[in-house]
Design a protein with these regions (language model features):
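A general structural signal for well-ordered alpha-helical segments in protein cores
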Residues: 13, 45, 49, 74, ...
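Glycine-rich phosphate-binding "P-loop"
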Residues: 123, 145-146, 256-257
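Catalytic alpha/beta core domains of metabolic enzymes, predominantly
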Residues: 113-114, 127-233
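C-terminal alpha-helical cap/extension of soluble enzyme domains
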Residues: 1, 19, 23-25, 185-188, ...
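Active-site beta->alpha loop and helix N-cap motifs at the rims of alpha/beta catalytic domains
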Residues: 1-129
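Alpha-helical structural signal in soluble globular domains
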Residues: 23, 47, 51-56, 80, ...
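Short secondary-structure transition/capping segments
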Residues: 40-43, 75-76, 101-104, 132-134, ...
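Glycine-rich, flexible loop/turn motifs
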Residues: 4, 36, 126-128, 152, ...
Length: 279
């Protein structure tokens, strides 16, 4: 969350962290896509990681977003996160420069070599212009500190191939809230969720239903949540989630350019969808 002047609102962020933990989430990700890391300065990025680790105080694991499109920068940030006490690092594929698959292997290997904590690969080609292929994940799975992948390609055929080629060596987490149950059904371990920012108990419940064996119940809950999920992605993430959190008392809907506040018509749809869940 940010103040109306665009400064990071650590009071609101601390309260958000506490609420997430009290709602039963299994872990926290700081400085990811939803955390607006792309518009933070290097110092803010470090401060926010350190703050999240301190605020969580060991209650749940903290995963730090440490990706960059420069390998050296990603290595430096990963080393900082490890030293600051993060439990793992979430590393998005390099964006804009569009590395080859061979380049991705070299990039992630360098980061994992520099880390003393587990590394989670993050594939979101719609945002990065770079697709981490299943065979590349399988190759990277041989590194002892590369343990999982957040899969947000949205391509179910590719995700099936990922399970076929790499599941034995990598945990797979859903990175798309509308595909949580399908990915869990293929063997996924959980989700790294945007939805959980605003409905954490429901996101936790969805996974609990699935892992308790109530697959139909989990699927039904996923379908009931779709109006909220769709509204949260009706504009580029994190624009809608920040609008929702501002309404809930966690900071303002201020974003740093080039992101701008949510269009009023879409905001109304989002807030109306949340009302159905008592928000």
């Amino acid at each position: 969350p940010m103040t109306s002047s665009g400064a990071i609102d650590y009071d609101a962020y601390g309260r958000l962290i506490d609420w997430q933990i009290e709602s039963g989430v299994a872990g926290l990700v700081t400085c990811g896509t939803t955390g607006e890391a792309s518009t933070m300065t290097a110092e803010e990025h470090r401060q926010t990681i350190a703050f999240a680790v301190k605020r969580a105080a060991g209650r749940v694991p903290v995963i730090a977003g440490t990706g960059a499109n420069c390998t050296e920068k990603a290595v430096e940030l990963t080393r900082f996160a490890c030293a600051a006490g993060a439990d793992a690092c979430l590393v998005v594929t390099p964006y804009y420069n569009k590395a080859t698959q061979r380049g991705l292997i070299a990039h992630y290997t360098a980061i994992a070599d520099a880390s003393d904590k587990p590394v989670i690969l993050y594939n979101v080609p719609s945002r990065t212009g770079c697709n981490l292929l299943p065979e590349t994940c399988a190759a990277l799975a041989g590194h002892p500190r590369i343990v999982a992948v957040k899969e947000a390609s949205g391509n179910i055929s590719q995700i099936v191939s990922l399970f076929h080629k790499a599941e034995a060596h990598l945990d797979v987490y859903s990175g798309n809230d509308d595909q949580i149950v399908p990915i869990l059904a293929m063997g996924g371990e959980g989700c790294i969720s945007v939805l959980s920012n605003v409905l954490p108990k429901e996101a936790v419940r969805l996974c609990e239903l699935f892992f308790s064996g109530d697959v139909r119940g989990a699927a039904a809950l996923q379908c009931r949540l779709l109006p909220v999920i769709d509204a949260l992605f009706s504009e580029v993430n994190p624009i809608p989630v920040k609008a929702a959190l501002a309404k809930m008392g966690y900071g303002t809907d201020t974003l740093r350019l080039p992101l701008t506040p949510m269009e009023e018509g879409r905001r109304a749809v989002l807030l109306n969808a949340l009302k159905a869940w008592g928000v």
